[in-house]
């Protein structure tokens, strides 16, 4: 889908660039596939802030999206494409031949009326799901499982994808967009194609209020706070912080590695590219 550029008729429309969602379904989601959703405001069960700068926003309902795609050898038709407030990608409502409805992540180049299917061996066509071991090398995939039957975990955000670059000894070699090359069991499911809405990264909100509608509150820098609030705070007049950048809790940031080693590190052939 394309981008919408606005004429600067008001200060808030100047420079605004939004996603054109005119082709998406405009009604309500399927009721049996949705659930009410309470807002946390970034607080945990003790009422303490665990994620800063969250709160408010439009009321949302959660859509149950099928990340497992384990209904094998039953074809489904794409009924409609929908907006989902819980993720950056669009979702597709599919109807199986036996009448069951489900939501899946909408891949690019899939439109209303297309047929998709999951199975041990299916056509390599956007929207079809199959084990990585059954796909030809070079296939572009998304919604990749890390454990068999656990549902897709990798490449689920708008416009993302991974590439199957090799197969060896029961494992598939998958190259992620970050540059990481890792091994995934060949029995793990993945969906062919890239995730929809690749222009999501090119949006420009245009005004603070649009971020507030999404539940994002203003993000404040540490150097403008008081010493009680942040290690960079305080000082007479404007200061540059006076120390190497740290988080509000004193942990070094901006390039400092915080990743904890784990058993599955042995499945990573090449690490993702450094941010520097």
Swiss-Prot record:
Select a single GO molecular function from the record's annotations and give it: rRNA binding
Query: Which Gene Ontology biological process is one annotated for this entry?
Result: cytoplasmic translation
In this UniProt entry, which cysteines form S-S bonds? none
Which superkingdom heads the taxonomic lineage of this protein's source? Bacteria
Pfam families attached to this UniProt entry: Ribosomal_L2, Ribosomal_L2_C
Q: Where are the transmembrane segments?
A: none
The record's keywords, sorted A to Z, are: Ribonucleoprotein, Ribosomal protein, RNA-binding, rRNA-binding
Against InterPro entries, the record matches this protein to: NA-bd_OB-fold (IPR012340), Rib_uL2_dom2 (IPR014722), Ribosomal_uL2 (IPR002171), Ribosomal_uL2_bac/org-type (IPR005880), Ribosomal_uL2_C (IPR022669), Ribosomal_uL2_CS (IPR022671), Ribosomal_uL2_dom3 (IPR014726), Ribosomal_uL2_RNA-bd_dom (IPR022666)
Query: Where do the record's region annotations for Disordered lie?
Result: 224-254
Ribonucleoprotein in keyword set: yes
Record bears the keyword RNA-binding: yes
Q: Which Gene Ontology cellular-component terms appear in the entry?
A: large ribosomal subunit
Subunit structure, briefly? Part of the 50S ribosomal subunit. Forms a bridge to the 30S subunit in the 70S ribosome.
Q: What does this protein do?
A: One of the primary rRNA binding proteins. Required for association of the 30S and 50S subunits to form the 70S ribosome, for tRNA binding and peptide bond formation. It has been suggested to have peptidyltransferase activity; this is somewhat controversial. Makes several contacts with the 16S rRNA in the 70S ribosome.
Similarity-based family: Belongs to the universal ribosomal protein uL2 family.
Identify this protein by name: Large ribosomal subunit protein uL2
Underlying gene = rplB
């Amino acid at each position: 889908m394309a981008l919408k550029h606005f004429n600067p008729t008001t200060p808030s429309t100047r420079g605004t660039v939004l996603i054109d969602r005119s082709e998406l379904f405009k009604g309500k989601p399927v009721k049996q596939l949705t659930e009410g959703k309470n807002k946390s405001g970034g607080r945990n069960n003790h009422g303490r802030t665990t994620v800063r700068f969250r709160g408010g926003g439009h009321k949302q309902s959660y859509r149950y999206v099928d990340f497992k795609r384990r209904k094998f050898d039953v074809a489904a038709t794409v009924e409609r494409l929908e907006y989902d407030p819980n993720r950056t990608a669009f979702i597709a409502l599919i109807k199986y031949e036996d009448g069951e409805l489900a939501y899946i992540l909408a891949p690019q180049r899939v439109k209303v009326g297309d047929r998709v299917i999951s199975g041990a061996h299916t056509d390599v066509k956007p929207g079809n799901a199959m084990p990585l071991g059954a796909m030809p090398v070079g296939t572009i995939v998304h919604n990749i499982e890390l454990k068999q039957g656990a549902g897709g975990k990798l490449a689920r955000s708008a416009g993302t994808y991974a590439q199957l670059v090799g197969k060896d000894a029961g494992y598939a070699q998958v190259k992620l967009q970050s540059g990481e090359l890792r091994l995934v069991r060949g029995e793990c499911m993945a969906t062919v194609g890239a995730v929809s809405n690749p222009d999501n990264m090119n949006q420009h909100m245009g005004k603070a209020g649009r971020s507030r509608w999404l539940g994002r509150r203003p993000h404040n820098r540490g150097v403008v706070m008081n010493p009680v609030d942040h290690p960079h705070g305080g000082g007479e007049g404007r200061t540059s912080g006076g120390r190497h950048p740290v988080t509000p809790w004193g942990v070094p940031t901006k390039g400092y590695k915080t990743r904890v080693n784990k058993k599955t590190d042995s499945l990573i052939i090449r690490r993702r590219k450094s941010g520097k």
